[in-house]
Amino acid sequence: MPSVSAVILKLAAAALSALLLSGVAANATSRIKDLANIEGVRQNQLIGYGLVVGLNGTGDTLNNIPFTKQSLQAMLERMGVNIRGATIRTGNVAAVMVTGNLPAFATQGTRMDVTVSALGDAKNLQGGTLLVTPLLGADGNVYAVAQGSLAIGGFQAEGEAAKITRGVPTVGRIANGAIIEREIEFALNRLPMVRLALRNADFTTAKRIAAAVNDFLGTKSAEPIDPSTVQLTIPAEFKGNAVAFVTEIEQLQVEPDQAAKIIIDERSGIIVMGRDVRVATVAVAQGNLTVSISESPQVSQPNPLANGRTVVTPNSRIGVTEDGKKLALVKDGVSLQQLVDGLNGLGIGPRDLIGILQAIKAAGAIEADIEVM
């Protein structure tokens, strides 16, 4: 008869196994909330022009940046200080652009974050304060007003013969630095229907979302319009209460589908491949041809009293080396992991892998779309 401790261990192992399996199953599905947005519910970009003051001599050079000088004069005149014709010498002011995103359903009096970026030749915005800056939308209306002290992620220090910079000291952020003054009207509760806009357009995913909604409601209220849009007719029991309807729909679980795709960033050498990438039978060989040229000119210096001249004789050395690589056979239908393991076995780096993947695609042996960024 097994001991009590053995039984407890078996029960614990079974519970852990069930937990792991449930985690795998949960990872296979996602909430509709994570797959799609409600059409019309979005952020709006705001932008404004302003001045940052209080800089420790790291602001704009007024003689080189005329718009900073003009803005400073206009601001002081609005405050009753007339400096027309006077010589202004200060390095504590910088012209900046202020940007931010107006959240959906934002109400008057709430706050939002803003980003402040130098527009002139300011070296550092550290320690600066943004003066009152109206933030405009694309329609030209003022939706928020920003002001506050900047938080800078980088820094710059310099001496007479050296300078060091970390990060970007000419860009800062003000948390909750803008107050919203105008709301954007969006009467969600009065809509007879809402549309779901998929973040990643896909026919299969759109159909699955519609099926999940219809199964939940027991009616044909959802219809996929195209790969990126699912139209939802609000049922009678939710009329005038679209918020409750959307809340219920967002929590439904759907298994998303996606096309096999390979993303390549040639600038950084980053390669990202989806799990559904498959490769047909193909042979791969890769070799690097390196040509190196070194110049070591020889200088003939005559005796100072010989009345001769200095002669420079060029001396070039050219070397060619080629890395011998084996021919690798990639079998039909291999998975992503097998493909990566096989190419790594050839000693291929990320940048060489970019060319190989493009060549395999050109040969018609790779079952995926390649997107080069």
From Swiss-Prot:
Chief place where the protein resides: periplasm
Keyword list, A-Z: Bacterial flagellum, Periplasm, Signal
Species name: Rhodopseudomonas palustris (strain HaA2)
NCBIfam families per record: PRK05303.1
GO biological process: bacterial-type flagellum-dependent cell motility
Family: Belongs to the FlgI family.
Recorded GO MF terms: structural molecule activity
Protein name per Swiss-Prot or TrEMBL: Flagellar P-ring protein
PANTHER family: FLAGELLAR P-RING PERIPLASMIC PROTEIN FLGI, FLAGELLAR P-RING PROTEIN
Primary role: Assembles around the rod to form the L-ring and probably protects the motor/basal body from shearing forces during rotation.
Keyword Signal belongs to the record: yes
InterPro entries per UniProt: Flag_FlgI
Secretion signal, residue range per the UniProt entry: 1-28
Subcellular location field: Periplasm; Bacterial flagellum basal body
Subunit structure: The basal body constitutes a major portion of the flagellar organelle and consists of four rings (L,P,S, and M) mounted on a central rod.
Keyword Disulfide bond: no
Gene Ontology cellular component list: bacterial-type flagellum basal body, distal rod, P ring; outer membrane-bounded periplasmic space
